[in-house]
């Protein structure tokens, strides 16, 4: 479990690489560029994790409670919430254990701590990979529902959605295990970066095509109305804003972490790259922020889910 300076590793397997690049960057920065390091207090980090944990637990509870939400679309949303929940749990657990070890409130053998760190690392990596996969699955589900509306229920069945989610979880566990085992191979890091870029391109293409189709649909409906241009312009701006939010949040929250991995593979000893490495904890905080924002974008906008969520909250009281 890392406990040196402000470097807190998301993946324990990267500890040696991160500490080496940090020390090299520090010595280089004495005569090199000034580094901007954004400090994220442990208290704030824990609070973000707990907010994400509670929020995603409510999403899972609401979907499990309401049988009307047992559909392929909500299956993907529920799995996204589970992935984000695991991201939050693993990061909160790792931070809490690290603070207890530093304070001397928790005594454990080095081998036990290392085993716990490896388990947390697998949880973190698998949940991150699965979270990205389910974001792509939600985009594909919405795309099929628009462009193949009449055949949607025959194409996207609940059983197929369940098989797809099982495959995603299995792929997440397998990829995280390989990543932990071969963390020092540049190809492994680059594969993760390519995977992220593929998900980004997939979401951008699908959502942009859906926006174009929606604008054409509105154009056909409003063709006979006098205020056709104003209606089309307003809808186009709203759709563009929605697309910008979807892709902007995705890129802002996930991009810095994968930029970090890219720089580890490309320029681990460069002074400028070492400046980026110093903000690794900030990149983790952004990923947890994504876990907070995901339910607001994909889950809480549904009226049926909001209604069930109120019932869950009233029942809990």
From Swiss-Prot:
Q: Which residues lie on this side of the membrane: Extracellular?
A: 1-37, 94-118, 184-191, 267-279
Asked whether the UniProt record includes Kinase among its keywords, one would answer no
For this UniProt record, the keywords arranged alphabetically read as follows: Cell membrane, G-protein coupled receptor, Glycoprotein, Membrane, Receptor, Transducer, Transmembrane, Transmembrane helix
Sections of the chain in a coiled coil: none
CC per GO annotation:
plasma membrane
Glycan-carrying positions? 15, 29
Superkingdom per UniProt: Eukaryota
Subcellular location as annotated = Cell membrane
Function, please? Receptor for MSH (alpha, beta and gamma) and ACTH. The activity of this receptor is mediated by G proteins which activate adenylate cyclase. Mediates melanogenesis, the production of eumelanin (black/brown) and phaeomelanin (red/yellow), via regulation of cAMP signaling in melanocytes.
Q: What is this protein called?
A: Melanocyte-stimulating hormone receptor
């Amino acid at each position: 479990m890392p406990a040196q300076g402000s470097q807190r590793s998301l993946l324990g397997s990267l500890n040696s690489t991160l500490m080496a690049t940090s020390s090299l960057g520090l010595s280089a920065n004495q005569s090199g560029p000034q580094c901007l390091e954004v400090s994220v207090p442990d208290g704030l980090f824990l609070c973000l994790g707990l907010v994400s944990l509670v929020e995603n637990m409510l999403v899972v509870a609401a979907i499990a409670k309401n049988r009307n939400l047992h559909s392929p679309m909500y299956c993907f949303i529920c799995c996204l919430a589970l992935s984000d929940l695991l991201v939050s749990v693993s990061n909160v657990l790792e931070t809490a254990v690290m603070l207890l070890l530093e304070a001397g409130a928790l005594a454990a053998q080095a081998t036990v701590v290392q085993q716990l760190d490896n388990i947390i690392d697998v949880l973190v990596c698998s949940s991150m990979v699965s979270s990205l996969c389910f974001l792509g699955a939600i985009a594909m589900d919405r795309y099929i529902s628009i462009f193949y509306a009449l055949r949607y229920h025959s194409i996207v069945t609940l059983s197929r959605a369940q098989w797809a989610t099982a495959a995603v979880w299995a792929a997440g566990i397998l990829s995280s295990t390989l990543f932990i085992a071969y963390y020092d191979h540049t190809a492994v890091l680059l594969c993760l970066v390519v995977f992220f870029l593929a998900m980004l391109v997939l979401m951008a293409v699908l959502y942009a095509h859906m926006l174009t189709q929606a604008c054409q649909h509105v154009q056909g409906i409003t063709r006979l109305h006098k205020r056709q241009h104003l209606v089309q312009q307003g809808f186009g701006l709203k759709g563009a804003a929605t697309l910008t939010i979807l892709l902007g949040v995705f890129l802002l929250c996930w991009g810095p972490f994968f930029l970090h991995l890219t720089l580890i593979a490309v320029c681990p000893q460069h002074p400028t790259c070492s400046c980026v490495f110093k903000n690794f904890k900030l990149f983790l905080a952004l990923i947890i922020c994504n876990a907070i924002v995901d339910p607001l974008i994909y889950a809480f906008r549904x009226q049926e889910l909001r209604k069930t969520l109120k019932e869950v909250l009233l029942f809990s009281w």
